[in-house]
Amino acid sequence: LIFGRAGLGVVSLGFGGPLGPEAPLIALVAQLSSRLSHILRVTQARVVELSVAGSLGVLFGVPLVLAGIESEEKSKNRNIGQRIVARGPEILAAISSLFVITKLLPEIGIHQFTSVNSAEVGFGIDLIWVALIALLAASLGLAIVRATPKARELVVSKIPGGAIPAGLLSGLILGASAVVTPLVLFSGHHEIQEILDSTIGIGNLLVVVALKTLVLIACLAGGWYGGQIFPLAFIGAGTALVVAELVNSSATLGLVAAGFVAASAVGIRRPALALLLGFVLFPATTWIPMLFATVIAVAVIGKRSAELPSH
């Protein structure tokens, strides 16, 4: 079972599935690390949390362990030194993932998104576009998260034969969409840079975003195994480019960063993690729009939390 899910994830990604690699990695690491809790004398949930965060840090090229993890021994009365000691396991896990990134796998590096002709987001009209993009991207992320389990229920109830026919049908949808545009294939991480570099028009961008949304829901509903962080980020980035083209804004990269963070934050319900990924993958000139987008995403999550399915 441990390696079955990981193998399914590899197959899904290898055949162009519009999903991220984090889900099979999480499944594998969580199962393996849970068996170490009695050796380390730490609760099973704690070991899994730290191990998953450490492995994701290596996957994304940045130590993520300290992002959004709360100590199980937290207390308002502790001083700074005691808090640091209590967070010792997170700190060690972060150092371990940083060592792997820099020493053992230096070639993965950190490759930031770029846009040659992009200007910085100003404090005037550009922030209005940031707010609009963040709201649109967060709403799209929310719609996808809500639609996926419903689509899965529909597939299970309406398609006879179990997993194989469901997988074939979703594969046909993915293949047909890829004929229209290959940008819908794979997670969307590298494809974000492609749409930043391309000169495709508004109509084509809308088609790409719509098809990416369709294949993401279809493949998850059809039993393909993978993560949603970068597919959602791609959808948010594509939405931002559509708005940037419509309003003729030159602050392309900042707007894309806002869409990236807003959509992924709502999708994974971890705004701090989405923001940290944005900080790593986008230059410092885009940090203000990303912070603004995170605030909007948090508001959307808070308002619609009851409607979001649990992880």
PLM segments and residue spans:
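Alpha-helical transmembrane segments and immediately membrane-proximal extracytoplasmic
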Residues: 1-311
